[in-house]
C-alpha cells in the first residue's frame, strides 16, 4: 500500500476513534440515568482511569516498538470498543469501574498512533505526517461533540442514543485498525539505522539482520536516549513543567463534568459546546504561537508563571460560580492556555532536542504526570474525600505553587542578567 494511502487510513482511524459523542455527557448519563451518586463516581469510579493509565503506560511504550505498532493500535481500538459495550449494556458501579480500566488502557496505547506513521513515511514527510495525524484527532472530536450538542440540545436523542452511536464508531475503528498494513520488523530496523550517520552498507545490514538485532538496537537506543535527554538542563526544566502541568490538566478534564453536574440538570444540556470549541480554538492558537518570534528560553519561565496564575484564578472562579456559562467559559480559557503553553514547550524543545527523542520524552513526562496525579487523587479524593468544589480550590492552589516556582526561576534569571550587565 502506498504511503499516502496509509496516511489517509491512519488519519481516518484517528478521526473515527476520537468520534466519541458520549464524552461531554458521561457524568450526566452515569449520575442521572444510572443513578450513581456524585460521591461514588468521584471516589470509586473516576480515579481508576488515572491508575489504569499509569500502570498501562510503560508496557504500552515499550511494547509499541517490540510488537511493531499495529497490535497496539488494535488493543487501543478494542479497549475503546469495550468501553462503549459496557456503556450500552452495563448498569452497575462495578461496570463503570471496569469501563474506566479499559479507558486507561485505550489512553495509554495512543502512543502507537503517532509512532506508526513515522515508520511508514520518509523522514522528510515527518512534519506533514504529524500535522495530519494531529488534525485528524481534532476533527474527530469537534464533529463528535458538535453532533452530541445538536442531538441533546435540540432533544432529538437521549444519552443512550449517543452511546449507541459511539459503539458503532468504535466498531468501525476496530475494523480500520485491523486493516492497517502491518509493519515488517526489517522496515522498523532500517528506519532506526538510517538515523545513524556512521552506518554504511545499510541494505546489507538489514538483509542479514535478525529480529533479535532489532530488539537489541531498540533497547540500546533507549538507554542512550535517556542519557541524552536528561543531561540537558533546559530539557529537564521543561520536562518538570510538563509533568506538573499535565498532572493537574488530567485531573481537571477528569472531574470538570462532575462540577458542571452540581448545577440543575437542564443547564447541562450544553456540555457539547465547550468541548467542541476547545479543539476549534486550539488550532489557531497553536498556529499563532508557533509563528511568534520570541526567545522562549529567556521568557518561558515568566509565561509559565503568568499562565499558571491565570489558570489558578479560573479554577477558583469555577469553584465558586453557580452559573453554567461562567463554568463553560473558564473551562475553555483554561484549556486554551494549556494548549498555548504546551505548544511553546514543544517549540522550545524542538530547537534543543532531536525530534526522534520526542516520543520517549513525552512518554516519561506523561508517566511522571500520572504518578503525581495518582498521589494528588489519593490525597484529595481518597483520603480527604473533598467535595468537588473544594477539590477545585485545591487545584487552584496547585497552580499558584507552580506559578511561584517558575516565577522564582525567572526572578533568579532576571537578577543574574541585571548583575552581569552592571558588572560589565
UniProtKB/Swiss-Prot annotation:
Q: Which GO terms describe its molecular function?
A: folic acid binding; vitamin transmembrane transporter activity
- SUPFAM superfamilies the record matches: MFS general substrate transporter (SSF103473)
Entries under InterPro entries matching the protein: Folate_carrier, MFS_trans_sf
Q: For this chain's UniProt record, which GO biological process terms are given?
A: transmembrane transport
Q: Which family does it belong to?
A: Belongs to the reduced folate carrier (RFC) transporter (TC 2.A.48) family.
Q: Could you tell me which NCBIfam families the record lists for this protein?
A: rfc
Q: What is this protein called?
A: Folate-like transporter 3
The gene from which this protein is expressed is folt-3
